[in-house]
Amino acid sequence: MVGVQICQGMTSEILFFSLQPQFSNMMNKNSRLHIDSNIRNTFFTEIGIGVSANSLLLLFNIFKFIHGQRSRLTDLPIGLLSLINLLMLLIMACIATDIFISCRRWDDIICKSLLYLYRTFRGLSLSTTCLLSVLQAIILSPRSSCLAKYKHKPPHHIFCAMLFLSVLYMFISSHLLLSIIATPNLTTNDFIHVSQSCSILPMSYLMQSMFSTLLAIRNVFLISLIVLSTWYMVALLCRHRKQTRHLQDTSLSRKASPEQRATRSILMLRSLFVLMSIFDSIVSCSRTMYLNDPTSYSIQLLVVHIYATVSPFVFMITEKHIVNYLKSMYVRVLNV
């Protein structure tokens, strides 16, 4: 799994930013994508669903904070993840208009801003998912565990961690501000095309090696934390199930605690994230083998944003107050 993530980071971490020379003719082949209305409509439908779901989840978290409800350790990261995914999808929607739809050409500032922010938000989405896994492991840890002392840490510690990650990703992605340019009106194969208006200058071998090394270190570190936290949570849940097996016939044992429901949501998200990462890596490798086939390219466009689209639904179905509110709204609509 770690190897797959490293491969993903090197080949499709920024979705379009491939460093192999054979991708220099990408837009010659992928320019046909704007003609296929099915691909375009499916992609924008996915983006629209993701934007709506993340907006709804973010609003619920804001209302919960305003009403002064007791917050859990994972509430702030969940709200931040919904905000990050929302901004990432909105930026991707802007970039997609330059991929699928012929419009006026962008200048250097627009290209640099959009692609740099998109790259940063994709990295933050990955790190926030990892942070959620670690925090859930802390919540489930028993009082005798060394992790128990972190249960009652104030939220500003989590905010500081996210701020540090933001600065780190902005630094790692800073080279894109120099290498991203508006595609010049020249017939040349030296540029790696990102969209109809934007291109990326080819990097030197040293820069490629440094960039790939940073991505590899990041992925190994984050995936290691995810694997360790997953193993820890599964071990705790198995031990808890054994201890309460004799209570299976009681109503208390049938009711999942909020911690258990939250843990299930994190485990579901992690499984989804890993599956999408593996599939994304397979599609990326197929793009390399078939010289950026437009079909593989369009599939990757859809796959790489599934996690950001589906994750808010997983969070919402595990929150009772959100489910009850949506049910009441549904009943009101039927009674109108």
Swiss-Prot record:
- List S-S links within the chain: 111-198
Cytoplasmic topology ranges: 64-75, 141-157, 235-264, 318-336
Regions crossing the membrane = 43-63, 76-96, 121-140, 158-178, 214-234, 265-285, 297-317
Localization recorded for this chain is: Cell membrane
Q: Which residues lie on this side of the membrane: Extracellular?
A: 1-42, 97-120, 179-213, 286-296
Task: State the annotated membrane topology for this chain.
Answer: Multi-pass membrane protein
Q: Which Pfam families match?
A: V1R
Q: Where do the record's glycosylation annotations fall on this chain?
A: 185
Gene Ontology biological-process annotations: response to pheromone; sensory perception of chemical stimulus
Which organs or tissues contain this protein? Expressed in 1-4% of neurons of the vomeronasal organ. Only one pheromone receptor gene may be expressed in a particular neuron. Not expressed in the main olfactory epithelium.
What this chain does, per the entry, is described as:
Putative pheromone receptor implicated in the regulation of social as well as reproductive behavior.
What is the protein name for this chain?
Answer: Vomeronasal type-1 receptor 102
Organism from which the protein derives: Rattus norvegicus (Rat)
Task: List the gene name.
Answer: Vom1r102
